[in-house]
Amino acid sequence: GEPREWECRRWHLVPSCAAGWVPQAPSTRNDIRDCSTDPPYLPPTATNTTARLAALRDTMRAHDVHAYIVPSTDAHMSEYISKRDARLGWLTGFTGSAGTSVVTQDKAALWTDSRYWTQAERELDCNWELQRTTWIESIAMWIMEAVPVGGNISLDPFLFSVATWNSYSQALYGSGRTLLPLETNLVDQVWGDQRPSPSSSKIYSLPAAFTGSSWQEKVAGIRQQMEQHVRRPTAVLLSGLEETAWLFNLRGDDIPYNPVFYSYTLLTNTSIRCLFVEGVTAGAGSAGSLSSGCPGPLCVELREYGQVSAHLRNYTLGDVTVWLGTEYTTYGLYGIIPQEKLLEESYSPVMTAKAVKNAQEQELLRAAHVRDAVAVIQYLLWLEKTVPQGQVDEFSGAQHIDALRRAQQHSHGPSFQSISASGLNAALAHYSPSNGSSRTLSAGEMYLFDTGGQYLDGTTDITRTVHWGPPCTEAYTRVLMGNIDLSRLVFPSNTAGRTVESLARRALWDVGLNYGHGTGHGIGNFLSVHEWPVGFQSNNVPLAAGMFTSIEPGYYRDGEFGIRIEDIALVVEAQTKKPFLTFEVVSLVPYDRNLIDLSLLSSEQIQYLNSYYKKIRERVGPELQRQQLQEEYEWLQESTEPFPVGSAVTTTATTAMLALTSLLSVLLSGLQA
């Protein structure tokens, strides 16, 4: 936990924010539930789930199920899902993108991470316990307390990855409870005809100018990896939606904000490759690009989405070996393949190949970020004019930046629901406003916006935090220091992201602060905004040149404010004698000068900022002029004025950074993945 009392005293030392800061007692809040009162207090944002739970429990009894586990994902382990797959949201009322619920005959609980704790308190009714962790061991312990020995614990095996199933199985092993896969989804049964219909979007081919290579070249590369593998697999099973989309240079609109379509692919080493698409006719528009190799080893055979299990079962009757990624292939599909015919790795060769962008893909993503910066700069200038007049609320702000992005060339809309959060709402890391409940932006409060765009040439994601009044600068500056320290790091090849991510936290740690979410994630070329397996978590692959990742430290004080600074960076070769790597930041929007306390920065950090601002001027300035945005161009020149490097800078910060760098170089030699 945070040293809250000490921390509050520390913030009172900052004159610019001491006068306006008033601690808020939990009892005065009306935006979250209070289950201790009689009757319980529920905010308007909470959902009454009593009838849904009663119906689910009836269905559980009919199937002899004592505990039922419901995840937040779909059959492809997608983070963003269609309304039809939002089972957790329908059952609980919780709309966050990550969570797990368990229902027994007399209890119900939701597990989610710190990004969503306050959101859950706003959306859950008092039928639900909120468990502030995501550990499967914690879920299993709760289940063992709630379910007697001999009880059946069930889940839908087509909604849990192999890795997650194994974790549950291990956590419950020897407990006397049975983990029972149940292919009939009990939530779907209760949801009934109220469940949204399947998507019917068209699949289309990505124009050649926006692909790094042809799909035939990509297939040849994957087959080469199959031949070179010691196990010589005969097929690769692709179940991540972005895998099939990337491999065949196809896109669709089955999931909001994500240009993907429901599909599986079984890529074999011979003439048959099956693309299982929801409603085969939906793929007719792109059939020409796929059938060009028929007959022969590059002939794509289209099959119905619902046939994947039967086809996989039939294929594995032969003398075959199927390669799959256990992190995101479902236990339901995995269970069809005989154990001796499996090649299990965390990620498929398609997933790892997609993560490393070639030179063409890198240029496409850079270009997308230049135009995206134009839209964000337009938004910042608009905010400066309109917020002091009280004309903007969170929802209208989100709508405005979405519209600015849509006006840019090659735009396909936002890459996720825009996070537009002022004051205490910014303490919710993934808060999104609605038309019905939206705070007015104020010059006296922090405003955090985390937004992104989908363009034919790339996907973007950027967060800026701004303030138009007398600000609290220390928290913002320490978050910025973390962003800078990780962005300018030089590190050995093959370094695991988890070994360096603490640099983004160090300036916060120095004063006993932290943040609860991850430091970064991969990003796609007109694909997913959160692209596996790149990032700084323990199950991410080692960093390699050509990978793109976000760098996004933050700091949040519940009920008061939130700060996050996010940029997208490309892993590139460093200018060193031996093969080392570093980051090239491709997000090109200046930070809020009003919030930067230069006295906390080292001279190296200020020099980095000045170099970054020079790059922004060089790359975004001409694009603003090309689009005849003269006022925005002048705003950019003013906002990227170089910072003074001199006596105001503390030498301690420099010395400490040098000491940390030398320590890190020693640590990294033993921590490479």
Question: For each predicted feature, which ranges?
Answer:
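C-terminal GPI-anchoring signal of eukaryotic secretory precursors
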Residues: 644-659
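Active-site neighborhoods and metal-handling regions in enzymes and metal-associated proteins
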Residues: 6, 17-647, 668-672
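Cleavable N-terminal signal peptides of Sec/SRP-targeted secreted and luminal proteins
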Residues: 1, 9-20, 656-668
